[in-house]
């Protein structure tokens, strides 16, 4: 598959404005350094993300998933393959009951902390100063001040490499 064909396929999945080539990664990381991604996409729904993952794996195309780009070092040589960024459109919170929330991976920890505090929910204070998103925090078990994500997470919904949602 040539470069134009790949870009066309990515645009079919996520829309014309959400797929780009040669995207400077320094504008997507907190360190503000790094070269360009060969391809950069921002899916706007779980369904788009699933289609994207299926397509990339079926086509044997390298990809990486990022959130807010917090503490992410990108080489000046850039990133080969496709960068999938989950941030702005994956930042919803759903209040399940008095002590349980369901949060999408792109929500910033500081924003979640504020939302939980506004509802009078405690236990997340340790994470509000961590510069990152929920997805990254879960992936690396972020922690501070004696608290860790593993101490407060009940479950996670994830996509496998075939794009299947697993709870």
List PLM regions with ranges.
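Anion-binding (especially nucleotide phosphate/pyrophosphate-binding) glycine-rich loop
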Residues: 3-134
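FAD-binding subdomain of flavoenzyme oxidoreductases
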Residues: 125-127, 134-167
């Amino acid at each position: 598959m040539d470069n134009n064909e790949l870009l066309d396929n990515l645009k079919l999945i996520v829309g014309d404005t959400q797929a780009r080539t040669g995207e400077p990664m320094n504008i997507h990381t907190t360190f503000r350094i790094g070269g360009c991604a060969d391809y950069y996409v921002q899916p706007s729904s779980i369904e788009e993300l699933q289609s994207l993952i299926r397509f990339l794996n079926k086509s044997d195309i390298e990809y990486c998933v990022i959130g807010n780009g917090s503490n992410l070092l990108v080489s000046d040589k850039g990133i080969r393959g496709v960068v999938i960024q989950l941030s702005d459109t994956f930042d919803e919170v759903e209040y399940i009951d008095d002590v349980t929330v369901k949060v999408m991976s792109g929500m910033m920890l500081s924003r979640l902390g504020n939302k939980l505090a506004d509802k009078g929910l405690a236990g997340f204070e340790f994470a509000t100063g961590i510069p990152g998103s929920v997805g990254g925090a879960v992936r690396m078990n972020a922690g501070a001040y004696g608290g860790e994500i593993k101490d407060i997470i009940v479950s996670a919904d994830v996509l496998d490499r075939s794009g299947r949602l697993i709870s």
